[in-house]
Amino acid sequence: MRKLVLTTLARENLKDVFEFIESEFGINSRIKFANKVNKSLNLIVINPELFPKSELNVRIHKCVITKQSTLYYTYTIKEIKVLSVFDTRQKPSKIKKFI
């Protein structure tokens, strides 16, 4: 089984999204989002090819967690590296600097 690695940027992105969701919608919404993230990560670990490749870079896959958040990752035989969790409400061109 591949090792799951979150980059520093991905950790910061998740922290920011968790804090935003909790402040705007409450702890229950934060927990629901965390469960969706965990479910998505489990699916990626089982089958990293499950999600489509990014239009910006064919070596990077994207997993839509919710319509407001997308997780970007790469993988090798040994590991899955989560690069970023992008808030899709941002200007779309901003993702280019993250992946």
Task: Briefly describe each language-model feature range.
Residues 38-39, 46, 50-79:
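Basic/aromatic recognition patch in beta-strand/loop cores that engages polyanionic ligands
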Residues 69-70, 74-99:
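Enriched for short, Lys/Arg-rich terminal
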Residues 1-34:
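Arg/Lys-rich, positively charged N-terminal/basic patches that mediate binding to nucleic acids
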Residues 32, 57, 93-96:
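Solvent-exposed interaction patches of small proteins and small membrane subunits
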Residues 13, 40-43, 62, 84:
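Residue-level recognition of specific faces of alpha-helices
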Residues 9-17, 51, 68-70, 92-94:
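Conserved N-terminal glycine/acidic-rich loop preference
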Residues 23, 43-46:
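Conserved amphipathic alpha-helical interaction elements at protein-protein interfaces in regulatory
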